[in-house]
Every structure is written in C-alpha cells, then in structure tokens.
From Swiss-Prot:
GO terms for cellular component: membrane. The chain crosses the membrane at residues 143-163, 175-195, 207-227, 232-252, 271-291, 309-329, 334-354, 368-388, 398-418. GO terms for molecular function: bile acid:sodium symporter activity. It comes from Homo sapiens. Residues 1-19 form the signal peptide. The keyword Membrane applies. This is Sodium/bile acid cotransporter 5.
Length: 438
C-alpha cells in the first residue's frame, strides 16, 4: 500500500513539474511572424533560457513543411553563462513559402521530453543573387541609354524656361522654401515614425519608412509642377535647397529615429550620391539658362518639346520603378502598401495646406505640395543598403520602393483628373460662348 502511494506521489510531482515547465517560455527567436530568405544559405538564430543539471542535455528539432523550398543542414549549439544559443543553418532551393516548426527537447537517459515548441514560422524564399544596389542593372541597358539623354535634354529645356528674376523674388521672400523644408525634414519623418508604430512594423521596416520620409524633394517634382501648372522654377529651386539641407538633416534624423526604434550601429549617409543628385540637376539647368540668353531660337524649340517630353519621362519613370521594385512587391504586406499610399498623400496635403494658410498664390501652393509629397526615395535606399546587413537591408528597402511606386501612381492619377477637369471647363466655356453668340 505504501509503495503504491509513493508511486502515485512521484507521478503527481512529475506531472506538476512538467506543467510548470510547459507554462514557461524558454525559446527566443528574433521574429516568429515571417522570415524573408534571399540567399542560397541562410541561418535562424534561436536563444534558449532552459536550464538543466546537464548543460548538453537540451537540443533543437527543426521540422520543415516543404523540403523542396528549404532544407536544414545542421544545428550548431553554443552554451554561455546565461543562455544556450542555437544556429540553424539552412539552404534554399526553390522560390516559395513554407512553414518551419522549432522544438526544444531535453534528453534524460534514454527518454526525451518536449520542453517547448514554436509552430508555423512562415518563411518566404525569394531568389535574389544581387544586392538591391545592383538591381537597376537588370533593367534593359537600351532603355537606360535612351532615357539618360532624354532626362538631360528635359532638364536643359527647363533651364530655357527659367526666369532669373524669380530667384531674386524667392531670395527676398523664402517662405515657400522654408515651408517645404519644415514639412520634409521635421513633419514627414515624425509622421512616418508614427504611422509605422500604429501598424506595428518591424524595426528595420519602420526605419525604412522614416528614412524615406526624411528624404529631400525630388522624384521629378519639377515635371509634375509643370504639368499641373505650378511654379516649376520654384520647384527646381526647392529641390536644390532641400538636397543641400539633406546633407545635415538626413544624418540627424537617422540618428534620432534609429535610437528611438532601438537600432544600434553606424548609419552611413551617401554624401556622394546627394552631391551627384544636386549636380545632375544644376549642370543641365545651367546649360539651358545659357542657351536661352545666347541662342534664343534653340531655346524656343526646347520650350516647345518640354511638355510631351515630360509626359514620356513620367511614364518611363513609373515603368522603371515598377520593374526594379517588382521583387519587393512580393514581400509587401498590407501595412507597407497602406503606408506607401499615405506617405506621399500626407506630404501633398501638408504642403498645400500650409501654403494655403500662408495665403501664397495657387501655383506656389501646388509647387510646395508637390515638393513636400514627391520625395527622392532612392536616397533612403542607399542609406539602408550602406547601413544594414543584407538580410535586414532587404526587409527595410521595401518601404522606399513602395513609396516611390505609390507616389508615381498618385501623381499620374492627379494629373489625369486635373487635365480632364481642365478640358471639361474649357468645353463648357466654349459652349457658353457659342450660345451667347447665337
């Protein structure tokens, strides 16, 4: 009888101990929602706080749902004073999605006991041999060789339309430039941070959104200013000014928001790319100004082709952005797409509202809005690629490409609506004139 009671008591104690163990969480993995793999060889780092009398008694078991997509090579184990770290080495085969289950087991003699299990860690495998900075090289070289002279010619044509007197006016009354700078470097980064926290983006993606929002004006803002009857001379001046300010404000914002997001490390600002962007605008525009004063007949020809050329470049730019960013669309989730739509829309709204409150002329209001909403997102891409390891950089780079694509689509929609409205007004006015004459 005593022996039976002892056995029952022993089983009860074991059951209580197992229940206590199952209620604890020993495994710690950096991210359990979704993992993006782009290289042939990848690793998953798992930390275990489980302790036993024998340190080597615990081990990991990894179960992969689809071995055609992902295969495990081995699991390396490293014991430290406060935790046991496991490195799961994997190789990727095909593109696709699969689920990974990770189990922590404890060996006691010939018996094994399941301590904890992390189920259904989703893994997306995207074959991408090159880095994102090399991605544009996959675009047809013939298109690039054709588009580059057209861009330079277009900037030169803008130089022919510039009135130098306007520079003096802006210098005396720099309010539009100040409004654009405040919106771009203070309000937009804060909005990007706030939105990324609301939708609970991972730290790397949130930083990508913030860096996109702290970029200077660009993205063909002067093209859209011309097509929407804004002040394109002011747009060029605002782009150049904000690009210069980016040399100071991008490092400041990257430091502030990386610390808030808990990201450590050194963030590299692509100074050479910022300067080259500035020169890429100033040199052809300056040539256009010289042509206007030295060869007026050539300048008048360039002014005539500027609108059709701007339309062509706008469509080609959207096409190239989608071509380069296609790989990122595969990794986009609903939250990132939503932010991609909101960021340019908020920039346009803030810029236009502030300019309207300051009672600026309508063309100036349009220009401030465009320069605040159309950001040079590819500078953010350069910052991310230079600052993060490749796996984290791929995740963070989704935001700049998504914002660039959404910006182009939104501006195209605005231009089409604006042109349609303008044509309807012209048609109605023409009809009224005819009725009046009759």
């Amino acid at each position: 009888m005593i022996r039976k009671l002892f056995i029952v008591l022993l089983l009860l104690l074991v059951t209580i101990e197992e229940a206590r163990m199952s209620s604890l969480s020993f495994l710690n993995i950096e991210k359990t929602e979704i993992l993006f793999f782009t290289k042939t060889e990848e690793t998953i780092l798992v930390s275990s706080s489980y302790e036993n009398k024998r340190p080597n008694s615990s081990h990991l078991f990894v179960k992969i749902e689809d071995p055609k997509i992902l295969q495990m090579v081995n699991v390396a184990k490293k014991i430290s004073s406060d935790a046991t770290n496991f490195t799961i080495n994997l190789v990727t085969d095909e593109e696709g999605e699969t689920n990974v289950t990770i189990q922590l087991w404890d060996s006691e003699g010939r018996q094994e006991r399941l301590i904890e299990e992390i189920k259904n860690v989703k893994v997306k495998v995207l074959k991408q041999k090159d880095s994102l900075l090399q991605a544009p090289m996959h675009i047809d070289r013939n298109i690039l060789m054709l588009i580059l002279p057209l861009i330079l010619l277009n900037k030169c044509a803008f130089g022919c339309k510039i009135e130098l007197q306007l520079f003096q006016t802006v210098w005396k009354r720099p309010l539009p430039v100040i409004l654009g700078a405040v919106t771009q470097f203070f309000l937009m980064p804060f909005c990007g941070f706030l939105l990324s926290q609301i939708v609970a983006l991972p730290e790397a993606q949130a930083f990508g959104v913030v860096m996109t929002c702290t970029c200077p004006g660009g993205g063909g803002g002067y093209l859209f200013a011309l097509l929407l009857d804004g002040d394109f001379t002011l747009a060029i001046l605002m782009t150049c000014t904000s690009t210069l300010l980016a040399l100071i404000m991008m490092p400041v914002n990257s430091y502030i928001y990386s610390r808030i997001l808990g990201l450590s490390g050194t963030f590299h600002i692509p100074v050479s790319k910022i300067v080259s962007t500035l020169l890429f605008i100033l040199v052809p525009v300056s040539i256009g100004i010289v042509i206007k004063h030295r060869i007026p007949e050539k300048a008048s020809f360039l002014e005539r082709i500027i609108r059709p050329l701007s339309f062509i470049l706008m469509f080609v730019g959207i096409y190239l952005t989608f071509t380069v960013g296609l790989v990122f669309l595969k990794t986009d989730n609903l939250e990132v797409i939503l932010l991609g739509l909101l960021v340019p829309a908020l920039g346009l709204l803030f810029g236009y509202s502030f300019a309207k409150v300051c009672t600026l002329p309508l063309p100036v209001c349009k220009t401030v809005a465009i320069e605040s909403g159309m950001l040079n997102s590819f500078l953010a891409l350069a910052v991310i690629q230079l600052s993060f390891p490749q796996s984290k950089a791929n995740l963070a780079s989704v935001a700049p490409f998504t914002v660039a694509m959404c910006s182009g689509c939104e501006m195209l929609l605005i231009i089409l609506v604006y042109k349609a409205k303008k044509r309807c007004i012209f048609f109605l006015q023409d009809k009224r004139k005819r009725n009046f004459l009759i």
